[in-house]
A protein has these predicted regions:
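Aromatic-lined glycan-binding groove of carbohydrate-active enzymes
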Residues: 121-123, 128-130, 160-161, 165-182, ...
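Catalytic domains of cell-wall/extracellular-matrix polysaccharide-remodeling enzymes
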Residues: 72, 80-138, 142-156, 164-167
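Acidic (Asp/Glu)-rich catalytic clusters
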Residues: 1, 19-30, 45-56, 87-88, ...
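Structural preference for beta-strand elements that scaffold enzyme active sites
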Residues: 4-8, 28-34, 93-97, 123, ...
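Active-site beta-loop-alpha junctions enriched in small/polar residues
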Residues: 10-12, 34-40, 99-101, 129-131, ...
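Active-site gating loops and adjacent loop-to-helix segments of metal-dependent hydrolytic enzymes
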Residues: 41-68, 190-192
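C-terminal domain-boundary segment and adjacent tail
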Residues: 124-125, 188-225
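Acidic-and-aromatic substrate-binding clefts and catalytic sites of carbohydrate-active enzymes
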Residues: 9-18, 37-43, 101-108, 148-154
Length: 225
């Protein structure tokens, strides 16, 4: 059902086991590892440069302000542990990316990210800021998160424009944040209602029909690129 083909998994969250179960129930879904540096706690306890006085990851603002400066070796160890946890759970990752695009905060983070992608021979996404030669698609659509908040006519215009972009490019990635609202999401994220709207648009809409009925459009995962 729907046209979503790829997801990405955070290994340090309470929903990890549930996500692994869903992945195994949907073997055609591409699943990447969503490397975490800015949410909850690390998996390791020997990475002091990554955490605040409470043992939590620093938030993104700490990196923007210069308060948080990670040790590259510690970041490598933590992200490597996150990837290994996914592998140990039976996940065969299709790609690497990161929460809050943490791998693009600076070149130090990006270098660690690239080293891990090479170690595990995995594509990387969300990296055009530093290395265009490593991009995985020819077009990246960053504005889909707001589609559910548009008025009906504006939404139709946006989706028609997006469809044309898909037709014009060899490979298109539409970044989305689909989901259902529960207590944990409400407490941990300010991005809630738009997730439900995205589910509807990606499963039951004229946009879905147009994508499915176009013989020139193929739905793929990062494994296919």
């Amino acid at each position: 059902e729907g046209i979503l083909t790829s997801a990405t998994l955070m290994t340090n969250t309470p929903g990890f086991e549930h996500a692994v179960k869903l992945s195994k129930e949907n073997p055609d879904l591409g699943v990447g590892v969503h490397l975490v540096l800015t949410f909850l706690k690390p998996l390791r306890d020997d990475v002091p440069s990554l955490v605040d006085e409470n043992g939590n990851f620093y938030r993104p603002d700490a990196y923007r302000s210069g308060l948080a400066i990670v040790d590259s070796d510690e970041l490598y160890k933590e992200w490597d542990t996150q990837i290994q946890k996914a592998l140990d759970a039976g996940i065969e990752p299709t790609h690497l990316d990161s929460h809050h695009h943490a791998h693009t905060f600076n070149e130090r983070h990006f270098d660690v990210f690239v080293k891990l992608s090479e170690k595990y021979d995995l594509p990387i996404r969300g990296n055009a800021e530093y290395d265009h030669s490593r991009t995985t698609t020819t077009y990246f659509e960053p504005a889909f998160d707001g589609v559910g908040l548009l008025e009906k006519k504006e939404q139709e215009v946006y989706l028609d424009t997006l469809f044309n972009r898909i037709k014009e490019n060899d490979a298109t990635e539409i970044m989305c944040h689909t989901g259902y609202i529960d207590e944990f999401l409400i407490k941990s994220s300010s991005f809630t209602d738009p997730r439900i709207y995205q589910v509807d648009i990606l499963t039951d809409s004229k946009f879905v029909e147009k994508i499915r009925n176009d013989k020139d459009i193929e739905l793929v995962t990062f494994r296919d690129l």
